[in-house]
């Protein structure tokens, strides 16, 4: 079974943990408890293939940013999360993306831009068009989600698996060649 290393990044309080826990455990975490680093594993089926996702839920707070380079180096796909209710969280994404591209040393990195908390429409300050435009600029997928209302949560991770598969298809294991041996 192929394994996928997915890293969830974004500012503090945008709902990275809520999205991850909703996907992995199907529960919504109501209280905010800043994450240092949590790792989750979940087996899913995407396009008929069994996949093991290893999801790294990272710290959004500044004091843990030194660990980011390591996450980015090992990650195969990235979820960049902002809150539609906080402009500053949207503004932080440019630097995060640049850091990913620098660490990976390529522009072709599987990535999904996620505007979370779409259930809080009345508190929206970041328009959907802004998210779409940034995703176009980043050349990546875009989704608005709600961990609370379970909107598009699974789609984020399935989309990333498909992007990773497209970028680096799994190589079929070749059977070792058998050679004939003659003993005299």
UniProtKB/Swiss-Prot annotation:
A Pfam family cross-referenced in the UniProt record is: Ras
Q: Where does GTP bind?
A: 10-17, 57-61, 116-119
Q: Which InterPro entries match?
A: P-loop_NTPase (IPR027417), Rap1 (IPR038851), Small_GTP-bd (IPR005225), Small_GTPase (IPR001806), Small_GTPase_Ras-type (IPR020849)
For this protein, the record's SMART domains field holds: RAB, RAN, RAS, RHO
| Modified residue annotations for Cysteine methyl ester | 181
Q: How is its activity regulated?
A: Alternates between an inactive form bound to GDP and an active form bound to GTP. Activated by a guanine nucleotide-exchange factor (GEF) and inactivated by a GTPase-activating protein (GAP).
* Localization terms from the record: Cell membrane
Give the first-level EC class, as a single word.
Answer: hydrolase
PROSITE patterns associated with the record = RAS
Phenotype upon knockout?
Flies exhibit disruption of the early stages of photoreceptor cell determination, adult eyes lack the R7 cell.
Q: Which GO terms describe its biological process?
A: adherens junction assembly; border follicle cell migration; cellular response to cAMP; dorsal closure; germ-line stem cell population maintenance; hemocyte migration; imaginal disc-derived wing hair organization; negative regulation of hippo signaling
Enzyme Commission number(s): 3.6.5.2
Residues linked to a lipid group, S-geranylgeranyl cysteine type: 181
UniProt motif (Effector region) ranges: 32-40
Q: Highest taxon of the source?
A: Eukaryota
| Propeptide residues, chain positions | 182-184
One GO cellular component term: cell leading edge
User: What is an example of a GO molecular function annotated in this UniProt entry?
Assistant: GTPase activity
Catalytic reaction equation(s): GTP + H2O = GDP + phosphate + H(+)
**How is this protein situated with respect to the membrane?**
Lipid-anchor
Q: Which UniProt keywords apply?
A: Cell membrane, GTP-binding, Hydrolase, Lipoprotein, Membrane, Methylation, Nucleotide-binding, Prenylation, Sensory transduction, Vision
Q: PANTHER family under this entry?
A: RAS, DI-RAS, AND RHEB FAMILY MEMBERS OF SMALL GTPASE SUPERFAMILY
**Protein task:** Ras proteins bind GDP/GTP and possess intrinsic GTPase activity. Plays a role in photoreceptor cell determination.
Record-stated family? Belongs to the small GTPase superfamily. Ras family.
For this entry, the protein name equals Ras-related protein Rap1
Protein species of origin: Drosophila melanogaster
């Amino acid at each position: 079974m192929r394994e996928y290393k997915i890293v969830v990044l974004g500012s503090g309080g945008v709902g990275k943990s809520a999205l991850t826990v909703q996907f992995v455990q199907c529960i919504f975490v109501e209280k905010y408890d800043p994450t240092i680093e949590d790792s989750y594993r979940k087996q899913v089926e995407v396009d008929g293939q069994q996949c093991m996702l290893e999801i790294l839920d990272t710290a959004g707070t500044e004091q843990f940013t030194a660990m980011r380079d390591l996450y980015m180096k090992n990650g195969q796909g990235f979820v960049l999360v902002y809150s539609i209710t906080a402009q500053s969280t949207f503004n932080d994404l440019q630097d995060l993306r640049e850091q990913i591209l620098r660490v990976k040393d390529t522009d072709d990195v599987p990535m999904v831009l996620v505007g979370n908390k779409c259930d809080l429409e009345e508190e929206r300050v970041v328009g959907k068009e802004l998210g779409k435009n940034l995703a176009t600029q980043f050349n990546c997928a875009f989704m608005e989600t709600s961990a609370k209302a379970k909107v598009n949560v699974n789609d984020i991770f399935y989309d990333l698996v498909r992007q990773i598969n497209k970028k680096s298809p799994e190589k079929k294991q070749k059977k070792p060649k058998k050679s004939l041996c003659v003993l005299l």
